[in-house]
Each structure stands twice: as C-alpha cells, then as structure tokens.
C-alpha cells in the first residue's frame, strides 16, 4: 500500500511526531489531522478554516473512519498502536521533560529572565531556508530558545513578550547575534555566497543605542562579501514610522544589511512597513502557506502577496512549509525561498552545522 510521510510539531511537548499515513489520506485530511493533534476543537478548526462546524465534524468523521480511529477518547491510542509514530525532541534526543503551559507564569518573570541572561541560558536555534527552484541551502532563520536547567526547553511565546515589555529583549538579541557569529565563524568558508541570516528584531532592539554596531560586528566577523544579514520585522512589537527610524534603516542598508517583513498578511503593521521603509524580503505567514492548497481564499491571498512583492522586486519566502504539496504550490506561485518542517525544524547550532552546513559545503 502507498504511504505518505506526515510530521506535526506538538509545541506543548516540544516534540515532532512522524507518522507514515496511508497514501489515500488527502492534503486536506492531513491538515485536519494536524490541527486535531495540536489540540484544536471542531469549533476552533471551523473558525480557522472558515468552514461551518457541521462541515468540519463531517470531515473529521470521515478521517477517523479512514484511519481506523474509533473516537476522541481513543484518538491517541489508535494513532500510536496503528501507525507506530517516531517521536523526536527538538534536540534530536528521545528523552523529554514536559511542563504544562499553565505553569510557565510561575517560572517566567523579569528576574528569572535577567538571571538566565547572566547564565547564557538563551540559545540560538537555527532553521534552514532553501532556494525554491534548486533546493539548495541559501540561508537560515535564527530563533531563540530558553534552555532552562530545571524545566528544559521553554518556548519563545512564553518569554518573548515579557522580555520585550521589560526591555531585556535588547540584551537577549545582542547575545543571540554574538552566539550566532561564534557558531558560524568556524564554518563560514562552507557557507554559500550571499548566505542569508535572518534574525527577528523588535522596536526596542532597533532603536537601542549600539544596535547598528552589533549588526556590523556580526557582518564583519562572518564576512560582508559572504553573508547577508536580514533583520526580520514583526507585527508583535512594531517599529514606529518616524524620520529617526527611517534614518536607521537607510544607514543599515548602506552597509548591505537587509530587511524582511515577517508573518506578512496577518496585520496592518507589515503593510505600513512596506509603505514606509525600504524592505527586501516578504515572508508569507505559515497560516496562508498551509491553507493555500485546501482553501481558495488563502490561495488568492498568497497570489496577491506574490504580486504585491513582484512589482518592487522583493524576494518572497514561504514559511511553515510542511508537505511536498505545499512546497510545489508555493513554487508554482513564484515564491523564491522555502522554509518549514518539511525540511527541518529549528535545531541547536551544532546540529545545524552538522546536518546542513557540512553537507552543503561538502
């Protein structure tokens, strides 16, 4: 019987579940299974997919019948017994330490973040980015993970908002940039030319004294003729559109430092950025990428984003690519770069070097 690979990241546990599903399971059904495994209810899925709860319930019933799942109560048991999933932690190990999201607020405080910064517990985890046409490694996005000595990996959505509101994000980003340079420095000769290194930047970081110097330090250490630093701007903590901010943009651009609009299409700020600042990349939000093959409206949104980016000559990255169908669709729509769990989750720096840089350079 034909089969298809299926991967889903369960953020609550910090693990990726890998299943081999029957080949008869469609792209739409795999998306539904992913949302169910991530804990979404029928009501939540109906809102997410812009479909009625009755329609989602019917699709869920058909999916359960196809996969031999008896009920919600036996959902996980039936999956584990029938499909023998491979469960891999983000570090690649088989040992896990779990913590319930409800308990994070007892751990994540400004004092705890400050102490963790002193102890260098925040580490860069790196996700590769590939050329859509050739499949060649062309860059990466650097993300931050809190490697807590007692509780294990704490996901960024649990500490980034507090780090931003407390101002500690400036020190965190500075550490992240330095660690990234240290990780890539020994293998910079193996990096392809114009290797893109994306780092998320909040308003606090962008406007902080010395930020431009930190960017130039990273670029100069790895080689301005070798790498291209891409500062990724988000909706969450937008940079104010002021003459002062524009002057910083222009100064960084003169040093060959580029800018990307992250999670594009999800809010007003990214469109305001596009109007006000000289950006170079648009990163299509994963919600549109993952829905484009099963939802006509999402597909049209992707088409509009691609057309919007094409006129000023911006490069386009599709984030959150999880299936080959999604990758093929994005390539067909004219996207330039692909990033997502189909290729690799974010991994620790040493694993990124061994799994991707050494292989690409060899």
Curated annotation (Swiss-Prot):
Residues 42-61 bind DNA. GO terms for cellular component: plasma membrane. Induction: Autoregulated. Directly regulates its own expression in a c-di-GMP-dependent manner. One of its GO terms (biological process) is regulation of single-species biofilm formation. It catalyses: 3',3'-c-di-GMP + H2O = 5'-phosphoguanylyl(3'->5')guanosine + H(+). Changing residue 298 to W: Slow monomer-dimer exchange. Equilibrium largely on the monomeric side, in particular in the presence of substrate. Strong decrease in activity. Changing residue 299 to S: Increases catalytic activity. Acts both as an enzyme and as a c-di-GMP sensor to couple transcriptional activity to the c-di-GMP status of the cell. Phosphodiesterase (PDE) that catalyzes the hydrolysis of cyclic-di-GMP (c-di-GMP) to 5'-pGpG. Also acts as a transcription factor to control its own expression. Is in a fast thermodynamic monomer-homodimer equilibrium. Dimerization is required for PDE activity. Dimerization affinity is increased about 100-fold upon substrate binding. This is Cyclic di-GMP phosphodiesterase PdeL. It comes from Escherichia coli (strain K12). The lineage of its organism: Bacteria, Pseudomonadati, Pseudomonadota, Gammaproteobacteria, Enterobacterales. The gene is pdeL.
